[in-house]
Amino acid sequence: MFGGKGGLGNLMKQAQQMQEKMQKMQEEIAQLEVTGESGAGLVKVTINGAHNCRRVEIDPSLLEDDKEMLEDLVAAAFNDAARRIEETQKEKMASVSAGMQLPPGFKMPF
């Protein structure tokens, strides 16, 4: 099934290497900062890889406008930042498993 003992041992070695790479990648992702925008850049929200809000920037012109619109723009900017960090996480995690010769449908135990 795995090409003999060497095949299984090699597979386990690959799994361990992948686990180490994924742990390192998760640490790197936690340090990332991504900025989401709404209202053509009038509202900007910066979050880190753990989805913690680090900074909110609001163009002064919005402070004179409708409070409800401003709240919607802040929420939209946060959602944009969250989407961007998710995309970045997927890309980085995909790069960790690239090149590994795993059987189709193989699930990592971590």
Swiss-Prot record:
Superkingdom: Bacteria
Localization of this protein: Cytoplasm, Nucleoid
Pfam families: YbaB_DNA_bd
SUPFAM superfamilies in alphabetical order: YbaB-like
Gene Ontology molecular function: DNA binding
UniProt keyword list: Cytoplasm, DNA-binding
Cell cycle found in the keyword field: no
GO CC annotation: bacterial nucleoid; cytosol
Quaternary state and interactors: Homodimer.
Family statement: Belongs to the YbaB/EbfC family.
Chain's role: Binds to DNA and alters its conformation. May be involved in regulation of gene expression, nucleoid organization and DNA protection.
Protein name according to UniProt: Nucleoid-associated protein KPN78578_04440
